[in-house]
A protein has these predicted regions:
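Bacterial N-terminal signal peptides
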Residues: 7-18
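Structural recognition of alpha->loop->beta junctions
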Residues: 124-156
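Short, charged N-terminal beta->alpha structural module
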Residues: 27-52
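A short, well-structured beta->alpha microelement
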Residues: 50-70
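Positively charged n-region of N-terminal signal peptides that target proteins for export
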Residues: 1-4
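Charged, low-complexity C-terminal accessory regions
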Residues: 22-27, 33, 146-180
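A short, gly/pro- and small-residue-rich
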Residues: 86-110, 157-164
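Ser/Thr/Gly-rich flexible loops in soluble cytosolic domains mediating phosphotransfer, phosphorylation
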Residues: 95-129, 171-180
Length: 180
């Protein structure tokens, strides 16, 4: 019985921490751009979740620096998919170059950048980790499916920047509603 109550208390605490951390992310300013780094399906999932939350985002799979400069907020979904690379005709080198371009433009134009990783532990392979290493320093805030943070990578890498750990991907809808 003690284990049951301890589990309930721990779950409630994690939920409260997630909500408290969300306050570190400012209200979303429009227009909002949604793009992918790594061409995994996560950005498509994020697009659907944003629609359900009634948060308007322009989804551009291959956004470039010129695109970014037109937006006040940018969500970048990071996760490498070899199938996505093949379908898109890109590779790690071309995605790295695009990443550098969009982050340079975001900094120059003052675009608030939120890194999103909702693929879970399955999207923490070697290539995704390389893309994350490129992207993490440039983000202003992070929204991560908590299973992807089992090793504490995002907690450590985020440092003092806002980090929201979601227990379920569907919790993104509530978070987006809070931020709009």
């Amino acid at each position: 019985m003690k284990k049951f109550f301890a589990t309930i208390a721990a779950t409630a605490l994690m939920y409260c921490i997630g909500i408290a951390q969300a306050t570190g992310i400012p209200q979303l300013k429009t227009p909002i751009l949604l793009t992918s780094l790594g061409q995994a399906a996560d950005a498509h999932t994020m697009s659907v979740l944003a629609k359900r939350a009634k948060v308007p985002m322009d989804f551009k799979t291959f956004a470039n620096g010129t695109d970014v400069s037109k937006y006040k907020t940018m969500f970048v979904c990071v996760g490498v998919s070899l199938k996505g690379f093949g379908s898109a005709g890109v590779n790690l080198d071309t995605e790295t170059a695009r990443a550098n371009d969009i982050f340079k433009s975001a900094k120059a134009s003052g675009t608030y950048t939120i890194l999103v990783h909702i693929g879970g532990s399955e999207r923490r392979d070697q290539m995704s980790n390389k893309m994350l290493e490129i992207a993490m320093p440039h983000a202003d805030a992070y929204i991560v499916y908590d299973q992807a943070n089992a090793d504490g990578y995002f907690t450590k890498s985020a440092g003092s920047k806002p980090l929201v750990l979601l227990p379920k991907t569907m919790k993104m809808i509530n978070l987006l509603k809070e931020l709009k």
